[in-house]
Amino acid sequence: MIVVGLIVGQPLLVCGQTGNEALVAPPDDWSQFRGTPALTGVSSAQVPQNLELLWTFDAGESIDSSAAIVDGTVYIGTYLGELIAVDLETGKPKWRYQASEDAGIGESSPAVGHGLVFVGDLAGQLHAVASDTGDGVWTFQTEGEIKSSPVVVGEHVLVGSYDGYLYSLSATDGALIWKYETLNYIHATPAVADGVAYFGGCDEVFRGVRVADGVEVFNLSAGAYTAASPAVIGNRVYFGTFDNEVLGLDLLSQEVLWRYEHHTRHFPFYSSALNVDGKVIIGGRDRMVHAIDEQTGEEVWTFMTGARVDSSPAAADGRVYVGSGDGRLYVLDLETGEKIWDFDTAAPLFASPAIADGKVVIGSQDGVLYCFG
Protein backbone atom coordinates (compact mmCIF):
# COMPACT_ATOMS: atom_id res chain seq x y z
CA MET A 1 0.00 0.00 0.00
CA ILE A 2 1.29 3.46 -0.92
CA VAL A 3 -0.22 6.74 0.19
CA VAL A 4 0.84 9.92 -1.57
CA GLY A 5 -0.20 13.43 -0.61
CA LEU A 6 -0.99 15.75 2.25
CA ILE A 7 -2.35 14.92 5.66
CA VAL A 8 -5.42 16.96 6.43
CA GLY A 9 -6.04 17.29 10.13
CA GLN A 10 -9.43 18.94 10.25
CA PRO A 11 -12.50 17.01 11.46
CA LEU A 12 -14.65 15.29 8.87
CA LEU A 13 -18.29 16.04 8.26
CA VAL A 14 -20.55 13.66 6.37
CA CYS A 15 -23.51 15.63 4.97
CA GLY A 16 -23.07 18.08 7.84
CA GLN A 17 -23.03 15.34 10.46
CA THR A 18 -20.48 13.15 12.17
CA GLY A 19 -20.31 9.44 12.78
CA ASN A 20 -23.06 7.19 11.44
CA GLU A 21 -25.99 9.61 11.65
CA ALA A 22 -26.27 10.31 7.90
CA LEU A 23 -27.64 6.91 6.90
CA VAL A 24 -30.89 8.05 5.26
CA ALA A 25 -31.14 10.55 2.43
CA PRO A 26 -33.28 13.62 3.24
CA PRO A 27 -36.74 13.71 1.64
CA ASP A 28 -35.93 16.31 -1.02
CA ASP A 29 -32.38 15.34 -2.05
CA TRP A 30 -30.46 12.32 -3.34
CA SER A 31 -27.09 13.99 -3.62
CA GLN A 32 -24.97 11.05 -4.80
CA PHE A 33 -24.92 7.35 -5.70
CA ARG A 34 -26.99 5.42 -3.10
CA GLY A 35 -28.23 8.67 -1.50
CA THR A 36 -25.62 9.22 1.23
CA PRO A 37 -21.88 8.62 1.73
CA ALA A 38 -22.68 5.43 3.69
CA LEU A 39 -24.33 4.06 0.50
CA THR A 40 -27.27 2.55 2.38
CA GLY A 41 -29.72 3.34 -0.45
CA VAL A 42 -32.52 4.59 1.82
CA SER A 43 -34.62 7.75 1.37
CA SER A 44 -36.91 9.44 3.89
CA ALA A 45 -39.14 10.69 1.05
CA GLN A 46 -42.84 9.85 0.93
CA VAL A 47 -43.50 8.29 -2.48
CA PRO A 48 -47.02 7.60 -3.84
CA GLN A 49 -47.90 3.92 -3.64
CA ASN A 50 -49.43 4.00 -7.11
CA LEU A 51 -46.80 5.61 -9.30
CA GLU A 52 -47.51 7.43 -12.53
CA LEU A 53 -45.10 8.43 -15.27
CA LEU A 54 -44.62 12.18 -14.90
CA TRP A 55 -42.18 12.85 -17.74
CA THR A 56 -39.39 11.46 -19.89
CA PHE A 57 -36.25 13.11 -21.22
CA ASP A 58 -34.28 11.77 -24.19
CA ALA A 59 -30.59 12.16 -23.39
CA GLY A 60 -29.52 10.86 -26.80
CA GLU A 61 -27.36 7.94 -25.64
CA SER A 62 -27.46 5.11 -23.11
CA ILE A 63 -27.54 5.90 -19.41
CA ASP A 64 -25.66 3.64 -16.98
CA SER A 65 -25.01 6.53 -14.61
CA SER A 66 -27.49 6.86 -11.73
CA ALA A 67 -29.06 10.24 -11.09
CA ALA A 68 -28.33 12.73 -8.35
CA ILE A 69 -31.17 15.05 -7.30
CA VAL A 70 -30.54 18.29 -5.39
CA ASP A 71 -32.68 21.43 -5.04
CA GLY A 72 -35.15 20.37 -7.71
CA THR A 73 -32.53 19.48 -10.33
CA VAL A 74 -31.65 16.02 -11.67
CA TYR A 75 -28.04 15.42 -12.76
CA ILE A 76 -27.21 12.50 -15.06
CA GLY A 77 -24.29 11.30 -17.18
CA THR A 78 -24.49 9.62 -20.60
CA TYR A 79 -22.34 7.55 -22.93
CA LEU A 80 -22.07 10.61 -25.19
CA GLY A 81 -19.84 12.04 -22.47
CA GLU A 82 -22.40 14.61 -21.39
CA LEU A 83 -23.37 15.63 -17.89
CA ILE A 84 -26.93 16.95 -18.11
CA ALA A 85 -29.02 18.95 -15.63
CA VAL A 86 -32.79 18.44 -15.90
CA ASP A 87 -35.61 20.16 -14.02
CA LEU A 88 -37.20 17.65 -11.62
CA GLU A 89 -40.71 19.08 -12.03
CA THR A 90 -40.86 19.45 -15.81
CA GLY A 91 -38.15 17.20 -17.28
CA LYS A 92 -36.80 20.15 -19.27
CA PRO A 93 -33.01 20.42 -19.65
CA LYS A 94 -31.26 23.25 -17.81
CA TRP A 95 -27.75 22.79 -19.17
CA ARG A 96 -25.36 20.30 -20.77
CA TYR A 97 -21.66 19.91 -20.04
CA GLN A 98 -19.40 17.95 -22.40
CA ALA A 99 -17.11 15.92 -20.16
CA SER A 100 -15.12 14.22 -22.91
CA GLU A 101 -15.19 14.21 -26.70
CA ASP A 102 -13.45 10.82 -26.85
CA ALA A 103 -15.04 8.81 -24.04
CA GLY A 104 -18.43 8.62 -22.39
CA ILE A 105 -19.63 8.71 -18.82
CA GLY A 106 -20.23 5.11 -17.81
CA GLU A 107 -21.41 3.96 -14.41
CA SER A 108 -19.86 6.88 -12.54
CA SER A 109 -22.82 8.72 -11.03
CA PRO A 110 -22.82 12.42 -10.18
CA ALA A 111 -22.32 13.69 -6.64
CA VAL A 112 -23.33 17.20 -5.61
CA GLY A 113 -21.71 19.39 -2.97
CA HIS A 114 -20.09 22.82 -2.50
CA GLY A 115 -22.17 24.19 -5.38
CA LEU A 116 -20.49 21.71 -7.73
CA VAL A 117 -21.41 18.49 -9.52
CA PHE A 118 -18.66 15.86 -9.61
CA VAL A 119 -18.56 12.98 -12.10
CA GLY A 120 -15.95 10.66 -13.60
CA ASP A 121 -15.61 9.59 -17.23
CA LEU A 122 -14.16 6.67 -19.17
CA ALA A 123 -11.16 8.81 -20.20
CA GLY A 124 -10.11 8.80 -16.54
CA GLN A 125 -11.01 12.38 -15.68
CA LEU A 126 -12.97 13.60 -12.69
CA HIS A 127 -14.92 16.74 -13.54
CA ALA A 128 -16.20 19.46 -11.21
CA VAL A 129 -18.99 21.52 -12.79
CA ALA A 130 -20.93 24.48 -11.40
CA SER A 131 -24.32 23.10 -10.40
CA ASP A 132 -26.26 26.22 -11.41
CA THR A 133 -24.65 27.06 -14.77
CA GLY A 134 -22.96 23.88 -16.03
CA ASP A 135 -19.62 25.66 -16.39
CA GLY A 136 -16.51 23.55 -15.85
CA VAL A 137 -14.57 24.51 -12.71
CA TRP A 138 -11.75 21.94 -12.59
CA THR A 139 -10.72 18.50 -13.81
CA PHE A 140 -8.35 15.87 -12.43
CA GLN A 141 -6.74 13.24 -14.63
CA THR A 142 -6.21 9.65 -13.44
CA GLU A 143 -4.47 6.91 -15.41
CA GLY A 144 -7.47 4.64 -15.91
CA GLU A 145 -11.20 4.66 -16.56
CA ILE A 146 -13.41 6.02 -13.80
CA LYS A 147 -16.49 3.86 -13.23
CA SER A 148 -16.54 4.50 -9.49
CA SER A 149 -18.86 7.29 -8.36
CA PRO A 150 -17.41 10.26 -6.46
CA VAL A 151 -18.25 10.70 -2.79
CA VAL A 152 -18.21 14.13 -1.14
CA VAL A 153 -17.05 14.09 2.49
CA GLY A 154 -16.40 17.52 4.01
CA GLU A 155 -13.74 19.15 1.84
CA HIS A 156 -12.74 15.82 0.28
CA VAL A 157 -13.96 14.23 -2.95
CA LEU A 158 -13.15 10.51 -3.06
CA VAL A 159 -13.11 8.46 -6.25
CA GLY A 160 -11.62 5.18 -7.41
CA SER A 161 -9.99 4.58 -10.79
CA TYR A 162 -9.09 1.65 -12.99
CA ASP A 163 -5.45 2.70 -12.45
CA GLY A 164 -5.78 1.00 -9.05
CA TYR A 165 -5.79 4.13 -6.90
CA LEU A 166 -8.37 5.61 -4.57
CA TYR A 167 -8.00 9.39 -4.79
CA SER A 168 -8.85 12.13 -2.32
CA LEU A 169 -9.10 15.54 -3.94
CA SER A 170 -9.91 19.01 -2.68
CA ALA A 171 -13.54 19.73 -3.52
CA THR A 172 -12.84 23.39 -4.21
CA ASP A 173 -9.92 23.18 -6.64
CA GLY A 174 -9.24 19.50 -7.40
CA ALA A 175 -5.81 19.47 -5.75
CA LEU A 176 -4.57 16.01 -4.79
CA ILE A 177 -4.76 15.47 -1.02
CA TRP A 178 -3.67 11.82 -1.08
CA LYS A 179 -3.92 8.67 -3.17
CA TYR A 180 -4.02 5.08 -1.96
CA GLU A 181 -2.69 2.26 -4.14
CA THR A 182 -4.35 -1.14 -4.51
CA LEU A 183 -3.29 -4.09 -6.65
CA ASN A 184 -5.97 -3.88 -9.36
CA TYR A 185 -8.88 -1.85 -10.73
CA ILE A 186 -11.20 0.01 -8.36
CA HIS A 187 -14.70 -0.27 -9.80
CA ALA A 188 -16.75 0.17 -6.64
CA THR A 189 -17.73 3.41 -4.96
CA PRO A 190 -16.35 3.83 -1.42
CA ALA A 191 -18.82 3.95 1.47
CA VAL A 192 -17.87 6.39 4.21
CA ALA A 193 -18.69 6.01 7.90
CA ASP A 194 -16.94 7.40 10.99
CA GLY A 195 -14.27 9.04 8.85
CA VAL A 196 -13.27 5.82 7.06
CA ALA A 197 -13.81 4.97 3.38
CA TYR A 198 -14.61 1.28 2.86
CA PHE A 199 -14.36 -0.36 -0.57
CA GLY A 200 -13.65 -3.59 -2.37
CA GLY A 201 -11.72 -4.06 -5.57
CA CYS A 202 -10.60 -6.32 -8.35
CA ASP A 203 -7.66 -7.48 -6.19
CA GLU A 204 -10.14 -9.41 -3.98
CA VAL A 205 -9.36 -7.31 -0.88
CA PHE A 206 -11.87 -5.26 1.13
CA ARG A 207 -10.25 -2.20 2.67
CA GLY A 208 -10.90 0.71 4.99
CA VAL A 209 -8.88 3.89 4.47
CA ARG A 210 -8.99 6.90 6.76
CA VAL A 211 -10.41 9.88 4.87
CA ALA A 212 -8.31 12.44 6.73
CA ASP A 213 -4.92 11.08 5.66
CA GLY A 214 -5.33 8.00 3.44
CA VAL A 215 -3.96 5.56 6.01
CA GLU A 216 -5.29 1.99 5.82
CA VAL A 217 -7.17 0.90 8.96
CA PHE A 218 -9.02 -2.19 7.67
CA ASN A 219 -7.89 -5.02 5.40
CA LEU A 220 -9.68 -8.31 4.85
CA SER A 221 -9.66 -10.80 2.00
CA ALA A 222 -13.03 -10.91 0.25
CA GLY A 223 -11.97 -14.03 -1.59
CA ALA A 224 -13.28 -12.75 -4.91
CA TYR A 225 -13.37 -9.90 -7.40
CA THR A 226 -15.68 -7.19 -6.04
CA ALA A 227 -17.37 -4.67 -8.34
CA ALA A 228 -20.31 -3.93 -6.02
CA SER A 229 -20.20 -0.98 -3.66
CA PRO A 230 -20.68 -1.70 0.06
CA ALA A 231 -23.39 -0.46 2.40
CA VAL A 232 -22.25 0.51 5.91
CA ILE A 233 -24.49 0.78 8.95
CA GLY A 234 -23.22 0.76 12.52
CA ASN A 235 -20.28 -1.62 12.76
CA ARG A 236 -21.45 -3.77 9.85
CA VAL A 237 -20.79 -3.67 6.13
CA TYR A 238 -22.49 -5.66 3.37
CA PHE A 239 -21.52 -6.27 -0.27
CA GLY A 240 -21.74 -8.84 -3.06
CA THR A 241 -18.91 -10.51 -5.00
CA PHE A 242 -18.24 -12.25 -8.30
CA ASP A 243 -17.87 -15.51 -6.36
CA ASN A 244 -21.70 -15.57 -6.18
CA GLU A 245 -21.78 -14.51 -2.52
CA VAL A 246 -23.01 -11.64 -0.37
CA LEU A 247 -20.81 -10.98 2.65
CA GLY A 248 -21.61 -9.46 6.03
CA LEU A 249 -18.52 -8.14 7.85
CA ASP A 250 -17.93 -6.87 11.37
CA LEU A 251 -15.83 -3.70 11.19
CA LEU A 252 -14.61 -3.95 14.79
CA SER A 253 -13.43 -7.55 14.82
CA GLN A 254 -12.54 -7.46 11.09
CA GLU A 255 -14.24 -10.80 10.60
CA VAL A 256 -16.68 -12.26 8.11
CA LEU A 257 -19.94 -12.76 10.03
CA TRP A 258 -21.75 -14.64 7.29
CA ARG A 259 -21.72 -15.53 3.62
CA TYR A 260 -24.94 -15.82 1.64
CA GLU A 261 -25.25 -17.81 -1.56
CA HIS A 262 -28.54 -18.85 -3.10
CA HIS A 263 -29.06 -22.60 -2.73
CA THR A 264 -29.71 -23.28 -6.41
CA ARG A 265 -28.86 -20.19 -8.48
CA HIS A 266 -25.12 -19.49 -8.38
CA PHE A 267 -24.48 -16.18 -10.13
CA PRO A 268 -22.36 -13.08 -9.38
CA PHE A 269 -23.61 -10.01 -7.52
CA TYR A 270 -22.83 -6.77 -9.36
CA SER A 271 -25.60 -4.72 -7.75
CA SER A 272 -24.82 -2.74 -4.60
CA ALA A 273 -26.64 -3.65 -1.41
CA LEU A 274 -29.53 -1.82 0.21
CA ASN A 275 -29.60 -2.02 4.01
CA VAL A 276 -32.92 -1.23 5.69
CA ASP A 277 -35.14 -2.56 8.49
CA GLY A 278 -32.85 -5.46 9.35
CA LYS A 279 -32.53 -6.62 5.76
CA VAL A 280 -29.79 -6.57 3.16
CA ILE A 281 -31.45 -6.34 -0.26
CA ILE A 282 -29.42 -6.83 -3.43
CA GLY A 283 -29.88 -7.66 -7.09
CA GLY A 284 -28.19 -10.67 -8.67
CA ARG A 285 -27.15 -11.78 -12.12
CA ASP A 286 -29.43 -14.75 -11.47
CA ARG A 287 -32.32 -12.37 -12.39
CA MET A 288 -33.43 -12.20 -8.76
CA VAL A 289 -33.70 -9.61 -6.02
CA HIS A 290 -32.56 -11.15 -2.74
CA ALA A 291 -33.52 -10.05 0.79
CA ILE A 292 -31.17 -11.37 3.48
CA ASP A 293 -31.39 -11.16 7.27
CA GLU A 294 -28.64 -8.74 8.28
CA GLN A 295 -27.86 -10.65 11.48
CA THR A 296 -27.84 -14.25 10.29
CA GLY A 297 -27.26 -14.09 6.54
CA GLU A 298 -30.35 -16.26 5.98
CA GLU A 299 -32.70 -15.68 3.07
CA VAL A 300 -35.85 -13.68 3.92
CA TRP A 301 -37.38 -13.53 0.44
CA THR A 302 -36.48 -13.47 -3.25
CA PHE A 303 -38.21 -11.94 -6.26
CA MET A 304 -37.64 -13.14 -9.82
CA THR A 305 -37.35 -10.65 -12.70
CA GLY A 306 -36.89 -11.40 -16.39
CA ALA A 307 -33.16 -10.64 -16.68
CA ARG A 308 -30.06 -9.88 -14.64
CA VAL A 309 -30.36 -7.24 -11.92
CA ASP A 310 -27.26 -5.01 -11.97
CA SER A 311 -29.33 -2.03 -10.81
CA SER A 312 -28.88 -1.28 -7.11
CA PRO A 313 -32.15 -1.23 -5.15
CA ALA A 314 -33.34 1.81 -3.20
CA ALA A 315 -35.98 2.02 -0.47
CA ALA A 316 -38.52 4.55 0.73
CA ASP A 317 -41.67 4.31 2.82
CA GLY A 318 -41.68 0.51 3.15
CA ARG A 319 -41.09 -0.20 -0.54
CA VAL A 320 -38.10 -1.31 -2.62
CA TYR A 321 -37.40 0.20 -6.06
CA VAL A 322 -35.12 -1.58 -8.51
CA GLY A 323 -34.50 -1.83 -12.23
CA SER A 324 -33.81 -4.98 -14.23
CA GLY A 325 -32.20 -5.88 -17.52
CA ASP A 326 -35.70 -6.90 -18.64
CA GLY A 327 -36.49 -3.18 -18.93
CA ARG A 328 -38.87 -2.98 -15.99
CA LEU A 329 -38.76 -0.79 -12.92
CA TYR A 330 -40.15 -2.86 -10.06
CA VAL A 331 -41.69 -1.72 -6.79
CA LEU A 332 -41.66 -4.46 -4.15
CA ASP A 333 -43.05 -4.72 -0.64
CA LEU A 334 -40.09 -4.42 1.74
CA GLU A 335 -41.39 -7.04 4.18
CA THR A 336 -42.63 -9.71 1.79
CA GLY A 337 -40.94 -9.06 -1.56
CA GLU A 338 -44.30 -9.14 -3.32
CA LYS A 339 -44.63 -6.97 -6.42
CA ILE A 340 -46.68 -3.83 -5.88
CA TRP A 341 -46.16 -2.21 -9.28
CA ASP A 342 -43.94 -2.30 -12.34
CA PHE A 343 -43.35 -0.27 -15.48
CA ASP A 344 -41.93 -1.49 -18.79
CA THR A 345 -39.44 0.95 -20.32
CA ALA A 346 -38.71 -1.44 -23.23
CA ALA A 347 -34.93 -1.03 -22.72
CA PRO A 348 -32.60 -2.57 -20.11
CA LEU A 349 -32.27 -0.73 -16.80
CA PHE A 350 -28.74 -1.05 -15.42
CA ALA A 351 -28.75 2.35 -13.68
CA SER A 352 -30.11 2.61 -10.15
CA PRO A 353 -33.17 4.53 -8.94
CA ALA A 354 -32.80 7.92 -7.25
CA ILE A 355 -35.57 9.02 -4.88
CA ALA A 356 -36.36 12.60 -3.85
CA ASP A 357 -39.34 14.92 -3.39
CA GLY A 358 -41.82 12.05 -3.78
CA LYS A 359 -40.36 11.06 -7.15
CA VAL A 360 -38.35 8.14 -8.52
CA VAL A 361 -35.88 8.81 -11.35
CA ILE A 362 -34.00 6.23 -13.44
CA GLY A 363 -32.23 6.17 -16.81
CA SER A 364 -32.36 3.42 -19.42
CA GLN A 365 -30.06 1.87 -22.00
CA ASP A 366 -31.90 3.59 -24.85
CA GLY A 367 -31.02 7.00 -23.39
CA VAL A 368 -34.38 7.89 -21.88
CA LEU A 369 -34.59 9.34 -18.37
CA TYR A 370 -37.84 8.49 -16.57
CA CYS A 371 -39.49 10.30 -13.67
CA PHE A 372 -42.34 8.70 -11.71
CA GLY A 373 -44.38 10.14 -8.87
Language-model features, listed with the residues they occupy:
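Bacterial N-terminal signal peptides
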Residues: 1-11
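A short helix->beta-strand "capping" segment at the edge of beta-propeller domains
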Residues: 42-60
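Extracytoplasmic beta-rich repeat domains
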Residues: 24-27, 34-37, 55-68, 93-114, ...
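Short loop/turn segments that connect beta-strands within beta-propeller blades
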Residues: 87-91, 130-134, 170-173, 210-214, ...
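Sequence/structural signature of beta-propeller modules
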Residues: 9-48
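Beta-propeller domains
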Residues: 79-81, 86-88
